[in-house]
Amino acid sequence: FGLMITMEEGDQSTDPRGIGNFASGVPLGESGLSSRRAPYSTDFSINDYTYGDSNNTAQITQPHGVGFVFATMLWDLTWAYVDKYGFDSDLFNGNGGNNKVMQLVLDGLKLQPCSPGFIDGRDAILAADMASTGGQNQCLIWEVFANRGLGYNASQGDSGDRTDQVEDYNLPPEEDPSLENCEVLSLENILNLASVYPNPSNGFVSISSEYINGQTTVQLID
């Protein structure tokens, strides 16, 4: 949540973000290794930690080390939402991907059981999306978690056991009914579908697209 509420316009998903940098004397706004094993980043050359690493008791301590691995996944999820819905600097009233994912994670916390494991946390977030959108982001959420080893066939074993996690990179089968309402278009995809010009408008606008043939209906909302 600390990373989410300190995001700024222009930040990139691959930027290295540290936690508690001040404790190491790192100036505000600059990245450092901080108090985690690696900075948070979607770039695997910066942060390549996956679910299986949570078994490594020599390097991944508890509670912060284990939480770091799950937070790495949530940071990837944050940027997946920003890619799809855009960024909104208004934390309280905004409707960007950063706003949506923060609410999603909060809703997931309300749904997960006591003493949760990684699978419990993942499934609670999926359930929160199903409850709030009917499952529009199920595919996106699965792709993010599977990319870090928390895939469809992953196992958390006993949530109280540090070394029985099994990672997996598979997605649910396409015929899984929970995926039927998936929306897979990102903001970039949408922008590539059509262009509206001129901007600013002189009272008239033109809409151009290479992907729409024949008649269609367009609704413009200001």
PLM regions and their residue ranges:
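C-terminal outer-membrane/trafficking sorting elements
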Residues: 188-222
